[in-house]
Each structure stands twice: as C-alpha cells, then as structure tokens.
Amino acid sequence: MLKCLFVIAVVCSMVACNKDYTGQWVSIKPGKSLRGWDTDGNKKDFGYVGDTLLLTGQSTIYYSGRINDARFKNFELLADIKTEPNAVAALWLHSGDVSGYQVLINNTPTSEERRKTGSLSNVRNIYKSITSDNEWFTLHVKVVKKHITVKVNNILIVDYVEPDEPYRTEENKGMRFSYGTVALSNYSNNNVKINSIHIRPLPDQEIPERKDALDEQKDEIIRMQQANFPVIDFHVHLKGWNQEQAMAHSRKIGVFYGIAPNCGIGFPVTSDADIYTYLDTTKNLSCFNAMQGEGREWPTTFSEKAREEFDYAFTDAMTFTDHKGRRTRLWMPDEVWIDIDHEKYMDIIVDRIVKVLKEEPINIYVNPTFLPEQMMPEYDELWTDVRINKVIEALVTKRIALEINARYCIPNEKIIRAAKEAGIRFAFGTNNADSDIGKLEYCIDMMKKCGITERDIFFPVVKPVKSQYVTGK
C-alpha cells in the first residue's frame, strides 16, 4: 500500500513538473525559505515581512523552479515592487553565467546612479523615473524573440528590437536575446520590496518577428549607451508631431528627450494656469519636462512656484531691445536692424547675452552664441577671446550649463573647449523646427573632439513623481 502511494506521488510530481504553462500566468514568487530560487550570496540578504519579500543586501537570486525548467525565451513578467530611497536593483532576463539583459530599478532622483526604473541597461537608458520611492509600482516586461517592451504602471518605457548584429562592447557582449532564467539583484544596502512576481511563457510558433531594428554597427547612440554616457536631447519641441509620436521616436532611436513648451507672451503657454494644464498632459510621458522662457518678460509672466514645477528651465538671448529701442529677434531676418558696423553690433549681442545669464532663472543657455544670418559668415572672427570670456564668466558665476546645439551647429569647437576648461557643464539639444529631429550629430562630433565625458553633462534634479500605480496579477 505504501509502495503504491509512493508511486502515485512520484507520478503526480512528474505530471506537475511536465505541465505546459504556455499562455498561463504563474506566480514565481520565492517561498519564505527562497524555495524555487537560488542565491549567489548570503540568504540573510533576503527575508519576508508578512507576505512581502525583502531584498536587503547586495546579492542576487535566480529562479530555479519547475516552470519551463527555469528556461524562458518568449514570455511576459509582472512584478509589484517598492523601493526605499537610494535603492538600486535590477531584474535580469535570459540570464546565464555571462549573458542576459537587465531592467533597472532606481526611483531616487538624487542617486548617483543616473539610470532610472525601466532602463534596459546600457541599451535603452531612462533618466527620469515615472514612479517614486516608498510607493508600489508594477513592472511589466514582455520578450518576444528579439523584441522587448518594458512598462512601468502600464506606461510604455522601452520598446527595443535587437538587430541580427547588435553593437556590444566586450564588457556587455552577453547582452543578447536567447533563453535563460530570470533573476533579481540588489546593488545597494537599501531595501527593495517585492509583493508579487508572475510569469507567462509565450509560444515559440506563430509569433511574427519584428523587422524594424536599427543598424547598430553604424549607430553612434548605441555606442554612447554601451559606455553609459547619458544620451539626452534636452531641447525638444512638439513641432510637426505630437507627444505620442515624439515618445515613440525617442524609444526607437535611444535618445531620452526633454520636451519643452514655449512659455511667454504670444506663445502657447502664457500663464501659471497654462503651465499646470500642460504638465497635466505629461504625467504619463517618460521624458524630462523642460520650460523654454520666451522674450525677456517670462520671469515675471510666471510665478516662481509654477516655474519650479518643470524639471529645468532654459532660454536664449535671441530676443532683446537693440541700441535704438527696437524689439529684436535674431532668427527673424525682418526683425534685425544692423545699421552700425558688425563689431559694434556684436558688442550689443554679447552685452545682452551676459545680462540674460546674470538676471534670468535658467539652468541651460540654449541656442548659444547665435548670430543673425548677415553676421554668420564672420562667426569665428566676431567671437573673440574677450567676448567668449565674458559669456563664460557669466555661465560660471550663475552655474548655468551650455547647450551644444545640433540644429545650428553652435557653439564652435573653440568656445566649447574654453567652456570645458572653465568647468562648465554641457547639455546636448536640438531645438527642432519639425519632426525631422536628427540624432545629435553635431553634439556627438563635439563630444569626441573636445573630450567631453559623462561627468561634463548637465543633469537636472527632478522632483519625485506621484505613482499612477496599477497592480499586477
């Protein structure tokens, strides 16, 4: 009788192990003894408070349970997670000894780790979390062949297709889609809480393969991502496209955007109420919220409280009152009156730039050193050392970053080198006139020529956001 019961138990166990879970959501949350998971560290780095799993130390746990024999290729995963301040963790996918991708978990705006929650590490880095510490959020990852999407609270953050020949550095050569287990790593000594983890294996057959991967062998952006250089266009406008189109393009090319409305008299945003209305439309966008101040009246047009709702503010000095009291806009040929010699007019431009930098509440000076079209052929001669130094001194004094502008290809290399020597931070920006935004080509060229490193790049301190928590399974 006992022998018969033993055989039945073994058979039942084998049936359970061999069960096909394809298309089914299954919990793979570790048991309180980490049942179904292995660890590369001390089990004391993991524990439970009630039904909540705690990752308390710098260790990794690997799923080793019975679902798909812990070998996943096409799948979806949902996890409900909460972080303490300064916690940095990761979810590993297709993990093996030296392979796999990791999705980062980091919600602290001021942490030294700039890559935030949802980042597909060093492939599609995200620089602003749409959730906050001490709040539950849902991480949703889906892998189909060579296509991965990452959602946070049901908001699409990453949409990446791995090409047949991806660009990978030697350090990151294991970042390839194949198959493997999933793992959780805590890179800090701050707690990460896991309320649930569910996985759904997907079928191998009848899944069309995405064919819209970029050619990474010729792509500069992936090289910067692999080097953990912050790939950010701080100066993007919704001109010629809408929010959804801009976000889709950002995800595709791997450049994180700072999207700015034009704020000032005669522009789309003209009041504090307009600011709050605009920001209400950006709650579900994975981007920086930037403010472009227009004209010289903008600091008094908007309250300080409303201005500070943005992640950062910028302006240029292209609008000013000239030597005869005429309102001048340097980029509009019919609103520029050069009735004195170019040297004298250049002194007026420099004086107006310095005044703007000293008096207006900005983080970045954009469209920098711009000259009207009549004077552009003399750009290098007109921007003398004395004039350059006046602008650099004002930037240093007010701790303002200098934009390297991809659209106008300014400032020139000489000015950028002088700014770097003075310790000024840089922001790459486009100031697009339409949806043909490019990929920061001039900025990257100057980065290489002038030896700009990731520590030379401006980075805003953003306010924590209120999570729009959508529970998982």
Would you name each region that the model predicts?
Residues 214-297, 305, 372-381, 390-391, ...:
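An N-terminally biased module of ancient metal coordination in phosphate/nucleic-acid-related enzymes
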Residues 17-216:
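Carbohydrate-interacting regions of secretory-pathway proteins
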Residues 230-233, 256-258, 286-288, 311-314, ...:
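Structural preference for beta-strand elements that scaffold enzyme active sites
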Residues 9-24, 223:
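Bacterial Sec-dependent signal peptides at the C-terminal "C-region" and cleavage site
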Residues 58-61, 85, 237-242, 292-298, ...:
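Short beta->alpha connector loops
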Residues 271-397, 452:
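Extended substrate/RNA-proximal surfaces in nucleic-acid metabolism proteins
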